[in-house]
Amino acid sequence: YGGTCINIGCIPTKTLLVAAEKDLSFEEVIATKNTITGRLNGKNYATVAGTGVDIFDAEAHFLSNKVIEIQAGDEKKELTAETIVINTGAVSNVLPIPGLATSKNIFDSTGIQSLDKLPEKLGILGGGNIGL
């Protein structure tokens, strides 16, 4: 909970930069990033849940302009509301370069944050904290 900034953007990438300057192992750097993002996710979830709203982690589609059907695993449920907030997030655009989408050695800024092991060599296209 918290969107791009907390989960895969500015917070984790800046955490990686600061932790790397402390001469930690790659595993320690990733653990630090995961701890910080996990705490912020928990805080954001608690803040929203504390307001009395219903929170659903599910896939959904509209049945009408005020009715959606949500599905989490095998469970389905219809929900009706005057106002429905669509919080879909986004995904990176993969350029139509042959082999790019299927390569196991090319990562976007989200995928590289999930690695268990530091690559021996790494080339980066992009800039700013997320690119670094």
Locations of the language-model features?
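FAD-binding core/adjacent interface of flavoenzyme oxidoreductases
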Residues: 3-8, 18, 40-125, 129
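Residues forming the Rossmann-fold NAD(P)(H) cofactor-binding site
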Residues: 132
